[in-house]
Every structure is written in C-alpha cells, then in structure tokens.
Amino acid sequence: MNDKTSQSKEDKLKEARKTLKPKLDAMRDKWLAKKADDIQLAADSNHSKDVYAGIKAVYGPQSSGSSPVLNQEGTALLSDKKDILDRWAQHSNNILNRPSSISDEAIESLPQVDMNHSLDHPPTTKEVEKAIKALSVGKAPGADAIPAEVFKAGGPGLVSKLTELFSSVWAAGAVPQDFKDASIVYIYKNKGNRNSCDNYRGISLLSIAGKMLARLLLNRLLDHIDYLLPESQCGFRAGRGTADMVFAARQVQEKFQEQNREVFTTFVDLTKAFDTVSRSGLWKIMTKFGVPDKFSALVRSFHEGMQASVSIDGDVSESFEVTNGVKQGCVLAPTLFSIMFSGMLKNAFPDDEDSIPIKWRTDGGGLFKLSRLSAKKRVHHGHVRDLLFADDCALNARSEEAMQRSMDKLSAACEAFGLTISIKKTEVLHQPAPKTNPEKPTITVKGQCLQTVESFTYLGSTLSSNVVIDKEVESRIAKASAAFGRLRNSVWERKGLTLKTKIKVYQAMVLTALLYASETWTVYARHEKILNRFHLNCLRKLLHIKWQEHIPDTEVLERTKLPSVPTLLRKNQLRWAGHVVRMDDSRLPKQLLYCELAEGERSLGRQKKRFKDTLKAGMKDFGIDPDSWENTAANRTSWRSSVNRGAKKYEQARIDEAKMKRALRKSRSSSNDTQTPAGSFKCKSCSRTFTHHLGLFSHSRTHTTSN
C-alpha cells in the first residue's frame, strides 16, 4: 500500500480513503452531537465541572509537560528528556512537600462536635453501588491501568467482591499501597511562559478502585459535616455551584448601591492552598468536627506513605514520598480542605463583628413588595461577611477600617493554620457610595499594601466597582469569540458535519461561554444589543451567509431554530429566580435576593436598575404574573413549562415585529423611489445629487463628521 510507484496500489489507497472518509465523518458527527447534548444538559443543570470536562474533550488534548523547561534557578533551558523528567519530579517534590503546621492553640479554640460513631460502620453493598455509579467514564486510570468502564460493567458479582474488599480494608484500618500512589501529568494553563513549570497544572492519576473507596468515605463524610460547614461555602457541595456565589456577590453590590452605602470586597488568594495543608493538624480538626478515630484513620491511610511519580510521554520519574497537603485528584481533597478552612474561619471570626447586617423576609406579598420589610414581626436578621468556593474567598465589609480589621484577623488565622496569603494576587474592590468621590483605600497584610482594582474576575465572572456589567459583557464576547475561533477548522469548516450538529456544538461551546453567569446579571438594552449582534454574526458565519445576500436577522434565527439573546437572557434569569425561590430560607442567595441592608436609605426619585427590575420586566415579557410567580416557581416542572412557553411567545413576537418594521421600511423606500425622479436627491451642503435617498443619507454623515 505504501509503494508509490505502483499505480494499482495507489488507486486502491485512494479508493480505501474515499470509502473510509464518509464513515469517519459520520462517526465524528455522531460523537460531536452527543458531546454537545451532554454539555448543554450540564450547563442547564449548573454542573460547571461537567461543562468544562465536555469542552476540553471537544477541543482535544492540551499541551503536556513534554516541552523544554527551565531549570530550578530559571537560568538554563533543559531539552534532554531525562533532564526534563527530573526537573518535573523536582518541581513536584518541592510543591507537594512544603512544610506547614497548625497551631495546637488554634485547634483547641474550636468547639467540639459530638462524635458520630455511625461513620465507623462497615460499608454496605448499596454504598458500593452508589460509589461505582458516581465514577466518571473516559478518565485516565492510575498505575493499575483498570478504567472505570470495567467497574461499571462488572455487575452484581463485582459489586459483591468489592464490598468484601472494602470491608477488609475497613477492618484493617489501612488501604493498599496502590490506592495511595499517584502518577502526575502536567498540563499547560494556556497563560504565561510555556517553559516555566509554574505555568502548568498537575493532574494526579489514581487507582479507580481507590477512587471508589474514597467516594464511599466522602458520601458518609458529607452527610455528617454538611451542616457544620459555613452557609457561604459553596465549593463541591451538592446543589451548590459558582452561580450561587457570583449571584451573592452581585446582590451585595446592588444592595449597597441602592441604599447609598460604600462596600469593600477583598478577594483573597492563598498560595498553593491544597498543597500546604498540614496533615497532622487536619486530623485533629476532623476530631473537633466529630469524626471518630476509625473513620479518620482510613482517611489518614490514603495520605500517609503516599508515593508519587511524574509521567511524560510514557517515561516515568523516580517516585518520591508526599508528606503534606490533601491528596490532589482525590474526591476527598476538596471536602477535607473545606473542613480545615472552615476551622480557620471560625478561629478568625468567632462573632459577627465587622460583618454586614441584613434583614429579609420571604413572605408578606412577594419579592416586589418593599413594604413587607417594614413589619415589626416576621422579619429575619442576619449577617454577611465571606463568600466562599473551595479556597476562593471574598471578604466584605462596610468601611475601610472594618475591612482592615477583618484582613488582620484572617491573616493571623491563616498563619496559625499554616496557610499563606499571596500579597501579589490578593486584590481589593472598593465600591464607593453613589455621588461621592472618596480616596483610594489602603488595605494591608503584614504591612504590605494590597492592590485596589476597579474590576475583578470572581469565579469566571467580572465584577466592577460601578456595578454595571459593561466589562463583563466585553469579557464574555472575547471568550466566546475565542471558543468560536478554536472550532473553525474542526467544526464550522468541516464538510462532513451536518448543520444540526454544528448548531448543537455552537450552543454548547459558544453560547455557553457567551452567557456564562448571565442569570445573575442586571441587563440594560445596550448589553442585549451587543450580545445579540455577536450571536447573529456567529450564526451568519456558521451558515456561510455573505452580507451581499441581504439576509435579515429573523431569517438567520429561523434557519438555525435558535432564539435571540434577549430571549435567552430572560429565560436564564427566570429559571434561576425559580431555583432561588425553591431554596431553603437559610441559603445565602435567597436571603440576599429578598433582603435589604439594616443600614442606609434609598434616594428619592427613580432608582438605578436592579436585578429584580430586570426580573420583573422579563416576567411581563413572558406573560408571567409578577404578583403570583413565586407560587408557580415553587414547582420546578410547572415553572419551567411557564418559562419555556413565555420564551417561545416572546421570541415569535420579536420576529413578527422585526418583519413588520422591515416591510414598512421597504414600502416607504419603494414609495419614495416612485414619487421622486432619479437623480433628484440633492445634498444641501455641497449640491451633489444621488439616485437613491440611502445614498444621500450615507453622504450626509461625511459632513457631520467633518464638522
């Protein structure tokens, strides 16, 4: 087949390629359509982890750590394979074995929770089945090379054997060495110097069987500690996600603007937070959280004696022991970190001093009735200080002095718990009270001044000190444009893919990036217009429509069977509002939606637009009664049906209105052309004549510009 001098063989090769190509195109089309459906479902369910995993699969593998890297001093570039492997092993060893400790005095200050001895009970068959079901397929396994698909297809017989294995591990109080060890691969972060090890992210490949046991432990641990974690912690907890904290942050900004108060928010960055957790201190904190010794010993066993090695293109470095930090790549790691971080926050802030007092009421006439908060009874009072997502921490305060005191307390607690605040990456966002011009604040950590910024990207969404989403819209368009560009050759220009599949990929990859966290936005008409213009431009490129064809926007939307951005925004926000309404009253997003500050007053006259104003307008556009919407939203199925019906009617009304306006413009133009002889459109400034009024209109703008 490779003999190029043989014409018959070359013809056979061409024929084989011709036969194979349609089959490969069909397979790719089917795979992309399925992956796009999965991404869209994850996006609709606010499962951000699954969204990003799907996006990575579509984009393909990222650059790994096989390229030349700088030595530890940063003075020489290493190109030899063995030198590169040794450098990565050295880098990993330095990161994963940083010494840290937690003060015994700080641990003793934490309250003791009653021991939950039910955690010590041996695992059951149902728990093993649940752990297997939670496994993610398509993931690289550890050193044993047994993928998750094998366990998922094993059936009852394998479940029984695994239950026996896990029970014996439970009785021994120690896990096998294979369950502990990790193989580390490095992926470039797509920012910074590609030759610097610091700009790569380490991924730990672990034994799938060990992951199942860790998942079993996690399921039990979550049931026990969920009520012990702060309400503001939304990282890696069921029913919570990044949208909760982005929404909370925007609501804090709006409430302070509405009631003419200033607010300070410090976004705290911790240096290698997961890798610097003191293990000995963590076990003691777990005891304080009511975790019994036997269960704690099993968790410890996953960490103590752990060996790791670096893998690059099939080559493996010498193994080294990992003595510090929670086990990266293990499902237990985020929860173990949250336990330690929760203990640190309790130590830093034992009371509500310097927090933000709020009052709220979820009954009394609904969200849009302000008088409900004037009642002397049934009004709840609370406080807001921190917004958390794993190790992402945003501290809020009402004054510069309160912010400084809070940072002093947090800094002292971090030092006591072995954590380090990154001065370079920690930033302050100051939102001054309306119609004031205050001086730039000075917030310090250990005598070093923190940078004050006008905007900050928090959990992927840009917050601005002026409480508008202009910069967020710019950022979203930039990210969506990059996503669209990355798929140009692999999807948009590929002839073997159907239009239906391309549209599915566009929805999952581009629209998801464009409208990320849009459910939390307070939207003005100008934002809708800019976003919709980008949306339609992408669809025109996808359909290969040229501007000379004069295809109206309505036809573009009808061809692709996609709604406009204004419809999508209203739909996202109303669905999110229903989700918030169904939350328990103890949840922070719900409290902030229904609350007002305990201090401060609204200005007289027209108020600046708020999220609930956007929400109310969306309800009216969708034909939903603003006075009774909460009753409908209490039922998820009924609410979604109402929102979907409203979206369909609103989009059709937009299309009909646009068509009517276009027809009216054409009729006017035709009438003018009939009544006015050719060449009689004359410029008043320079006497130039035109055959059509549109030419005169375009020409007249040159005089406006020159003036």
Q: Model regions: which residues?
A:
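Arg/Lys-enriched, amphipathic patches
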Residues: M1-L78, H117, H121, A134, ...
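Basic, alpha-helical interaction scaffolds
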Residues: A390, V445-W521, N537, P566, ...
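Catalytic palm subdomain of template-directed nucleic-acid polymerases
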Residues: N2, K272-F289, G325-V326, D386-F417, ...
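Conserved catalytic palm subdomain of right-hand nucleotidyl-transferase polymerases, strongest
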Residues: V128, G138-I146, N195-L205, A243-T287, ...
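Conserved pre-motif C helix in the palm subdomain of viral-like polymerases
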Residues: D198-L229, D244-R250, F274, T323-P357, ...
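Short, conserved micro-motifs composed of acidic
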Residues: S118, G366, S371, I421-E454, ...
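Surface-exposed loop/turn segments and immediately adjacent short secondary-structure elements
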Residues: D37, A42-C197, S204, K211-M212, ...
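C-terminal recognition-helix end and immediately following basic linker
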Residues: L694-N707
